[in-house]
UniProtKB/Swiss-Prot annotation:
Compartments reported by the entry: Membrane
EC number: 1.14.14.92
Transmembrane region(s): 4-24
Record's protein name: Benzoate 4-monooxygenase bphA
Length: 517
């Protein structure tokens, strides 16, 4: 055998084995052969991995649907279905589908609510925190959200007064940075009982510890989170690569794996601080970590330190850059669309007392135009732009979706970005920013059902109510107290990891007197 491998025929044998490695899975899934696929997507996961590595997977998949139609095979087992009629079939209650092995790449420390694939484990984990995020319960969080937004306003007022251009009156800043500081400090306050301190210091930093007993070090949390999202989404296309990722020649993977460890270290540090006896003794707040400590593991025991930290990490990830990315996108789309900010000014000035800087949730939750602006940004920007993959598990019967029959082992997804920009669903102006489309007199039942910024079904975002409250109060504050000018050319650039995130938004900002034209 060794002689054969070392002979001239060895190369041909190796090539033949390589071809069989990719060809056999293709032949095995004969029922998927009639679904068109771009490039080598039908034969190897590396095609999708490469698109994800480049940071524009959502665009490539969208273009593939424009070329091939509603069904596109984007990996040997994975079919993307650009059909709003498939949303409930793929993500709805009672279908038995599971999160695919894509989510294995996101596991750090211990499986958490986001990346667990076991249905019973997910039910147990969700039960621990779901009541904390109910509309009835989120009122307890508002004072902490409010306090951080007040500090945000204080810092912007300071910059408006001390850094303004004397000719234009505007102070220059990257709005994305400040939305990141705000979002991280809010989730730090809600989850761990204290903000990170980014707003106060005006910079991205966080303490991390490799273990609870390790000495502290400091990292840029926003940068760490970005890199972690990119590498995890990329490795999710080929989860078997994860153990070897740091040995790959592309530094993207080495840096990304380090970011995974650093982000886990941030959660370790925050949990460690929160569990200190003197902090526990003096704590009177019901924060997310307190709720998690009330939870039980699979044996009915209190959560161990590893699982508790993993769940805290889930809350940190879910509640930070999702909010900041969306806030930044809202500012961008409002600035680039004539007339929107003026309508916001009018609506906000009428609803909020003039002597109030940061409104309460009650003051802004029933302002229709503000809500329309937020929803329209979520539609056109699609912070979660990719199709979230679901696997049909063994034992499930075949299921027909969008006219095609799928079998156990197949993976399906519905691409949010493509659905949210479909002209068939949203009309000829689907790629334009039109807040008025959310007027109940205009919005169709189909459009309402096709809007899935928080996903849908049993694995939908558990923190939706808190996220919407944050966005309403943040946007109600920012647009009422400040005026803006665009200071960058061209569209706002984005890059996709697990989320579609802006790369920056350079604007001019100055104080606005509420009630002024």
């Amino acid at each position: 055998m060794l002689a054969l491998l070392l002979s001239p025929y060895g190369a041909y044998l190796g090539l033949a084995l390589l071809v069989l490695y990719y060809l056999l899975p293709y032949l095995k899934r004969a029922h998927l052969r009639d679904i068109p696929a771009p490039g080598l997507a039908a034969f190897t996961n590396f095609w999708l991995l490469l698109q994800t590595r480049r940071g524009h997977r959502f665009v490539v998949v969208d273009n593939a649907h424009k070329k091939y139609g509603k069904l596109v095979r984007i990996a040997p087992r994975h079919t993307s279905i650009a059909d709003d009629g498939a949303i409930q079939a793929v993500y709805g209650h009672g279908n038995g589908f599971l999160k695919s092995d894509f989510y294995d790449a996101f596991v750090s420390i211990h499986r958490g609510l986001f990346n667990t694939r076991d249905r019973a484990e997910h039910t147990r984990k969700r039960k621990t925190v779901s009541h904390t995020f109910s509309m009835k319960s989120i009122g307890q969080f508002e004072q902490y959200i409010h306090g951080n937004i007040e500090l945000f306003v204080k810092q912007w007022n300071r910059m408006a007064d001390t850094q303004r251009n004397p000719k234009t009156g505007f102070a220059s800043l990257d709005a994305l940075n400040w939305f990141n500081y705000l979002a991280f400090d809010i989730i730090g306050d809600l989850a761990f009982g204290a903000p990170f301190g980014m707003l106060d210091k005006g910079k991205d930093f966080a303490e991390m510890r490799k273990t609870p007993d390790s000495p502290p070090s400091y990292v840029q949390a926003v940068e760490v989170l970005n890199r972690r999202g990119e590498v995890s989404a990329t490795l999710g296309c080929y989860p078997a690569l994860k153990p070897f990722a740091k040995y790959l020649p592309d530094s993207f993977f080495r840096d990304g794996i380090q970011a995974v460890e650093d982000l886990a270290g941030i959660a370790v540090a925050r949990v460690n601080e929160r569990l200190r006896p003197e902090v526990m003794a003096n704590n009177t707040r019901v924060d997310l970590l307190a709720r998690l400590m009330e939870g039980k593991d699979s044996n009915g025991e209190k959560l161990g330190r590893a699982e508790l930290t993993a769940e805290a990490l889930t809350q940190l990830i879910a509640g930070s850059d999702t909010t900041s990315n969306t806030s930044c996108a809202i500012l961008y789309w409002c600035m680039r669309t004539p007339g929107v900010i003026e309508k916001l000014h009018k609506a906000l000035d009428e609803a909020i007392p003039q002597d109030v800087d940061v409104p309460t949730h009650a003051m802004v939750k029933d302002i229709p135009y503000l809500q329309w602006v937020i929803w329209e940004t979520m539609r056109i920007h699609s912070t979660s732009a990719m199709g979230l993959p679901r696997e049909i598990p063994a034992g499930n019967p075949p299921v027909t979706i969008s006219g095609h029959t799928f079998y156990p082992g197949d993976v399906v997804s519905v691409p949010s970005y493509t659905i949210h920009r479909s002209k068939e669903i949203w009309g000829p102006d689907a790629e334009q920013f039109v807040p008025e489309r959310w007027d109940p007199a205009r919005l169709t039942p189909r459009q309402k059902a096709a809007f899935i910024p928080f996903s849908t079904g049993p694995r939908a975002c558990v923190g939706r109510n808190v996220a919407e409250m944050e966005l309403l109060v943040i946007c109600g504050t920012v647009f009422r107290l400040f005026e803006f000018e665009m200071q960058q050319e061209g569209p706002m650039e984005t890059r996709e990891g697990f989320l579609r995130k802006p790369l920056g938004l350079q604007v001019g900002m100055k104080r606005r007197q509420p009630g002024s034209a």
